[in-house]
Swiss-Prot record:
It is an enzyme of class 1 (oxidoreductase). The gene is alkB. Changing D181A: Loss of activity. Changing H163A: 54% of wild-type activity. This is Alkane 1-monooxygenase. Residues 1-20, 63-88, 135-228, 271-401 are cytoplasmic. It is found in: Cell inner membrane. It comes from Ectopseudomonas oleovorans (Pseudomonas oleovorans).
Length: 401
């Protein structure tokens, strides 16, 4: 143990220049409350949609202005960096911030005169930041400590997506970039078509995985040890209390913010592995996932409000590695912008495809066999990109089935 400490202490001096900027990820959930304050002070209801304006407008512009950060912590300092408590505390503090955003917004809707348009704008704004509660849960849920894992469940309950805890860790990380993964999108598949199989597919896979785990322990899937039911119960209690306190408007407000929160995860899943495919080996199994099976983004500003989620390639290579330690690698497939801009592009399928499809084909070296392609778009792509895949349509058929 002493020798291990000597190794850590001898690591070269490293200064994380973004150390205190990560506070932006913790403060981001406060944005709807800032919008409420501005709307109240100015009388301009447009501020209820502040998060929409910042997320889909300001952040893509800031990403374009400030560009990318390719700096990595030296590998030898990563163990020491992982142990620095400050970074973990920021994720803990983010959990009550999400609850504050939900409760304050619900209180305002339930007690103040607002038009339905204003209520809708605030619900969508809250949906964006609470969709990113999934990102907070993602960071905490990959940790081994019981406290962290419970914090993940608690924050996932805010947006009613408790099954993410099981689905992402045990399902997506196992099946990513294969046809078995409902959370991997296919080239040519619009985000709207993707959502129809991704949202129910994620729940079905998560429930099946948890049922198998409990069965091996001789327990019913309806046991309180079910890690999907635990956050679901918190959600039901939380929403029931908000309904009792703030009235029937919650019957509209809460489902809208929840649905748009789910849409944020769908958007992330859609862009993170679009078209990418792990190849089958001779034994019929898929190759081990590698960093190049995820789309990466080093855009500075959006990474600072997302706990480095956009360094997704290293995350899949090292799932338990904390956000401050995630690295970039040369030659990784890269998104043209950060997640906010990519989410916006994804909602306009023609725009997204015009930018991303050539990138996917380039990633595959021009071989369409190495790409997950939506079955309805295969002939279109064969005509558009041609190349060596024309005689091997069986691979793409399997991909899209």
């Amino acid at each position: 143990m002493l020798e291990k400490h000597r190794v850590l202490d001898s690591a070269p001096e490293y200064v994380d220049k973004k150390k205190y900027l990560w506070i932006l990820s913790t403060l981001w959930p406060a944005t709807p409350m800032i919008g409420i304050w501005l709307a109240n002070e100015t009388g301009w209801g447009i501020f209820y949609g502040l998060v929409l304006l910042v997320w889909y407008g300001a952040l893509p512009l800031l990403d374009a202005m400030f560009g990318e950060d390719f700096n990595n912590p030296p590998e030898e300092v990563v163990p020491k960096l992982e142990k620095e408590r400050y970074y973990r505390v920021l994720t803990y503090l983010t959990v009550p911030m999400h609850y504050a955003a939900l409760i304050v917004s619900a209180w305002w809707v339930g007690t103040q005169p607002m038009s339905w348009l204003e209520i809708g704008a605030l619900a969508l704004s809250l949906g964006i930041v609470n969709g990113l509660a999934l990102n907070t849960g993602h960071e905490l849920g990959h940790k081994k400590e019981t406290f962290d894992r419970w914090m993940a469940k608690i924050v996932l309950a805010v947006v009613g997506y408790g099954h993410f805890f099981i689905e992402h860790n045990k399902g997506h990380h196992r099946d990513v970039a294969t046809p078995m993964d409902p959370a991997t999108s296919r080239m040519g598949e619009s985000i709207y078509k993707f959502s129809i199989r991704e949202i129910p597919g994620a729940f079905i896979r998560a429930w099946g995985l948890e049922e198998q785990r409990l069965s091996r322990r001789g327990q019913s899937v309806w046991s309180f040890d079910n890690e999907i039911l635990q956050p679901m119960i918190i959600t039901v209690i939380l929403y029931a209390v908000l309904l009792a306190l703030f009235g029937p408007k919650m019957l509209v407000f809460l489902p809208i913010q929840m649905a748009f929160g789910w849409w944020q995860l769908t958007s992330a899943n859609y862009i993170e592995h679009y078209g990418l495919l792990r190849q089958k080996m001779e034994d019929g199994r898929y190759e081990h996932q590698k960093p190049h099976h995820s789309w990466n983004s080093n855009h500075i500003v959006s990474n600072l409000v997302l706990f480095h989620l956009q360094r997704h390639s290293d995350h899949h290579a090292h799932p338990t590695r904390s956000y401050q330690s995630l690295r970039d690698f040369p030659g990784l497939p890269a998104l043209p912008t950060g997640y906010p801009g990519a989410f916006l592009m994804a909602m306009i399928p023609q725009w997204f495809r015009s930018v991303m499809d050539p990138k996917v084909v380039d990633w595959a070296g021009g071989d369409l066999n190495k790409i997950q392609i939506d079955d309805s778009m295969r002939e279109t792509y064969l005509k558009k990109f041609g190349t060596s895949s024309a005689g091997h349509s069986s691979s793409t058929s399997a991909v899209a089935s």
